Each structure stands twice: as C-alpha cells, then as structure tokens.
Amino acid sequence: MKLILLGAPGAGKGTQATFISKQFGIPQISTGDMLRAQVKAGTALGLEAKKHMDAGGLVPDAVIIGMVKDRLTQDDCKNGYLFDGFPRTIPQAQAMKDAGVPIEFVLEIDVPDSDIVERMAGRRAHLASGRTYHVKFNPPKVEGIDDVTGEPLVQRDDDKEETVKKRLEIYHSQTKPLVDFYGKWAAEGDAKAPKVRKVAGVGSVDNITKSVFEALK
C-alpha cells in the first residue's frame, strides 16, 4: 500500500494515519522527521538542507525528493508507505511523479470547515498538566476551570478561531490544486496514476476508519 494522505488541520488525519499504518504494516513518512534524521547523520543531502535552513530559507524540492527516494529504499518500506503532509505543492507532486515515486492512492479526509472550527476553537487546556477539554464535547465540571486543580483553563493561540480559519485557507489553496493534479493524471489513463479517493471525516472514529479501508480497496 503506497499512499498520500490529505486532510485539513483538525480533520483527524493523524488518527487515521495510525490505523492505516498498523493495518498495512507500513511506515508514516514525514518530511520533517526525514530532514532531522539526515541533518543529524550529516549526509550530503542533510548538509545541503542544513545550509538552506541555517540561512532561513526553504529546503529546495530537489533535496527533499532526494531524501524521499533514499527513505523509500529502507527495509520498513518494502510493503509500502504513507506520506503525511507531503507533497504540499504542485511542483513537489510533479517532482515525485518525475522521480518515479510509486503512489497507488491519494486519499483526502474531508471535513466541513465549520466542523473543524468548532472542533479546534472549542479546545481548552490546563497547560501545567497537559489536560485538555472541549467546551462542547468534553467540558470541565465548571466552565473555564480545570477539574483537578481549580485553576483557569486557557485557549491556545493555535486553537483561536481566526488562526484556525487562516490555516484552513492555506490548506485549501494548496490542496485543491493537488487533488486536481492527481485527478487529471488519472483521467489521462496512465497506469502509474494513483486512484483519488475522498472520505467524509465526520461521525464516529470507527465509521470513518471503516470508510477509509473501504476506499483503499
């Protein structure tokens, strides 16, 4: 199973990635982890990436694709792999296609923006203990107060409504073109093109997981 998993922040992509990984015995591949590993190991690609990072720039796609190809030669990828959060842009998707990185499925977990805003903007946290609540789905006994210490709860900056909406805007502007890119490739009748699937990410986790596995048949 070789797939790319797409989903907005707060869509529950991480949960489904874990289930897919376990079900098919494949690793989740995160470019952030790859970058850190290569920089730490001092490889040629790692040193090249570090040069750009130290200068405050973005690591060029060619370097990232080099790392991806290197990562896919490792033993744990023999049954496949799951790309989470990559590619993010058309040039990255095109570079993967040009490099001949095999992909069987592109799966998007689709959740309406209004649901994501409700999920994320309703989160409250007790920072000292790491306990989290939700004003609607998992409220504290007393509004705005931690159940254990009686201390006030806070809303993290990342969970503020305007921040969530901004992140969703960025996600849609990047992801819609990606889905179109893979859809167009599949429409050309190329046997190497992945199948593009969309699953509704609302409802119980079990039902979403069932839909995910159904889509990957």
Swiss-Prot record:
The keyword Nucleotide-binding applies. Residues 122-159 are annotated as: LID. One of its GO terms (biological process) is AMP salvage. Pathway: Purine metabolism; AMP biosynthesis via salvage pathway; AMP from ADP: step 1/1. Disulfide bonds: none annotated. The keyword Metal-binding does not apply. Keywords: ATP-binding, Cytoplasm, Kinase, Nucleotide biosynthesis, Nucleotide-binding, Transferase. It is found in: Cytoplasm. AMP binds at T31, R36, G57, L58, V59, G85, F86, P87, R88, Q92, R156, R167. It comes from the Bacteria. CDD domains: ADK. Its EC number is 2.7.4.3. It catalyses: AMP + ATP = 2 ADP. Pfam families: ADK, ADK_lid. It is an enzyme of class 2 (transferase). One of its GO terms (molecular function) is ATP binding. NCBIfam families: adk, PRK00279.1-1, PRK00279.1-2, PRK00279.1-3, PRK14527.1. Monomer. Consists of three domains, a large central CORE domain and two small peripheral domains, NMPbind and LID, which undergo movements during catalysis. The LID domain closes over the site of phosphoryl transfer upon ATP binding. Assembling and dissambling the active center during each catalytic cycle provides an effective means to prevent ATP hydrolysis. Belongs to the adenylate kinase family. Catalyzes the reversible transfer of the terminal phosphate group between ATP and AMP. Plays an important role in cellular energy homeostasis and in adenine nucleotide metabolism. This is Adenylate kinase. It comes from Dechloromonas aromatica (strain RCB). The lineage of its organism: Bacteria, Pseudomonadati, Pseudomonadota, Betaproteobacteria, Rhodocyclales.
